[in-house]
């Protein structure tokens, strides 16, 4: 029945939220997206806090945050963690969406209520399949470049509910072109919007909706550099829902992104950063490059960040609830209205409409910056302004790494940058004293902007082409004396 399929959707497709994420590495699949980009760094101070450095920084974080050839490789080189968790998890969930979409075809709803429920379940299923494929293609394939998306290797695209196995083939699944994956994502999101139009979602927030589908669709079109459609999807959403949270009225004890935030359209999964980015020795901190983007009258500067308690670094502040708790909002699978303003502003900027882009930025900033005076940008400055605003607002929400990838292939205004990561090494066997900082560099157009296909997948599908990542060695050593 429809209600059975609804239960399957809830139990096997939506990502549940965890209680008490002790450390980033204990979070959901994809937790490492937060430590790849230029918004964070590690902390150099006289002494590490034992808890963090001894376990996670050495074993779980090193390979990801310094863009190693093997992301699961520990700092000392003696451990190698599996790299297939995200791939396996999302393809398993996708497989269930395929089964649901197959089975719902065979149902004959007996009542009008059942008919509407079936439409809603279809909408949710198409949305989730799209969201999962979108994440996969942006991790395991190159960014969408309109010039070559038809020929660039994407990821396996499975849309059937049955098991496909041909014993005579060395490879069961082939990597289809990036363009084909995006085509399917757009198709799924349009289907979701259509089903939700006929049968609107009543349980917002933790269940997919037409609004969430429109927002994700506008993001997908941005990644495709299809500016007109990105504009249209964002505009369609903002006509339905456009309320921004006024950051001026966030109370001293409240976090910005919580269950009561009116901007949130959808969330699934956990808050991985409950205990992360403390800015203390042995942990990560917020990068100066990000922190310096906020003017002193920008409410976000004090809301999102705070000085660390035991170093001169910047810690993550009250963007999310801090300390161990049951997750109510995700930092990776979150969709909120703010993004629609930034998406439509970017689309305007790319369509040579600087005044339209300026208008959207001004409306947005009135809710973010004290005493904001409207500014009218010209075509020469507006794209950079939109990108800066996106970085300010959406930091630590799983956007920045993907934005850097897509900016690098942007036909209209390419932005390519190298990233340097200082990896702080402490004497983890005894006194936790700082030893040295090792600098690693992600070059412009570096192959490590794409993840290798997991080893276990290549062992099963022996003919599948891999994404080759280079060996990465440190480029310099930083010594600091705290005596």
Give the positions of each predicted feature.
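Short coil/linker segments at helix-helix boundaries
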Residues: 139-183
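Conserved, well-structured interaction surfaces
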Residues: 63-140, 176, 193-201, 325-335, ...
């Amino acid at each position: 029945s429809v209600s059975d399929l609804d239960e399957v959707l809830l139990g096997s497709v939506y990502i549940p939220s965890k209680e008490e994420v002790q450390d980033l590495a204990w979070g959901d699949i994809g937790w490492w997206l937060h430590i790849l980009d230029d918004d964070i760094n590690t902390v150099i101070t006289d002494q590490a806090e034992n808890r963090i450095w001894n376990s996670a920084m050495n074993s779980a974080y090193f390979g990801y945050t310094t863009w190693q050839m093997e992301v699961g490789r520990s700092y000392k080189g003696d451990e190698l963690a599996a790299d297939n968790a995200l791939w396996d998890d999302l393809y398993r969930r996708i497989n269930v969406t395929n089964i649901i979409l197959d089975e719902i075809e065979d149902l004959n709803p007996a009542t009008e209520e059942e008919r509407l429920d079936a439409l809603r379940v279809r909408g949710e299923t198409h949305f989730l399949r799209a969201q999962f494929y979108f994440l996969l293609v942006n991790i395991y394939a190159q960014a969408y470049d309109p010039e070559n998306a038809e020929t660039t290797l994407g990821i396996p695209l499975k849309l059937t509910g049955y098991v496909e196995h041909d014993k005579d083939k060395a490879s069961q699944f082939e990597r289809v072109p990036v363009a084909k994956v995006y085509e399917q994502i757009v198709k799924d999101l349009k289907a979701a919007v259509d089903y939700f139009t006929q049968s609107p979602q009543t349980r917002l927030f933790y269940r997919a909706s037409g609004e969430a589908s429109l927002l994700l669709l506008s993001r997908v079109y941005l990644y495709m550099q299809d500016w007109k459609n990105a504009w249209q999807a964002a505009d369609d959403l903002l006509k339905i829902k456009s309320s921004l949270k006024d950051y001026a009225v966030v109370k001293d004890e409240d976090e910005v992104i919580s269950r009561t935030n009116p901007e949130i359209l959808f969330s699934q999964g956990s808050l991985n950063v409950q205990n992360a980015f403390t800015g203390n020795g042995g942990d990560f901190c917020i990068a100066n490059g990000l922190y310096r983007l906020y003017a002193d009258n920008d409410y976000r500067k004090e809301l999102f960040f705070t000085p660390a308690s035991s170093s001169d670094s910047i810690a993550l502040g009250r963007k999310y609830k801090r300390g161990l708790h049951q997750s109510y909002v995700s930092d990776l699978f979150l969709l909120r209205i703010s993004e629609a303003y930034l998406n439509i502003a970017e689309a305007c900027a790319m369509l040579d409409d600087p005044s339209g882009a300026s208008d959207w930025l001004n409306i947005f900033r009135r809710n973010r910056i004290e005493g904001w005076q409207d500014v009218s940008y010209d075509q020469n400055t507006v794209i950079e302004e939109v990108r800066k605003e996106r970085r300010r607002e959406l930091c630590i929400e799983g956007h920045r790494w993907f934005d850097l990838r897509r900016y690098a292939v942007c036909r209209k205004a390419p932005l390519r940058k190298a990233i340097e990561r200082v990896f702080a090494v402490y004497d983890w066997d005894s006194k936790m004293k700082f030893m040295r900082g090792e600098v690693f560099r992600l070059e412009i157009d570096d192959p490590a902007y794409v993840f290798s296909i997991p080893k276990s997948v290549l062992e099963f599908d022996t003919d599948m082409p891999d994404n080759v990542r280079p060996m990465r060695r440190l480029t310099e050593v930083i010594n600091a004396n705290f005596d």
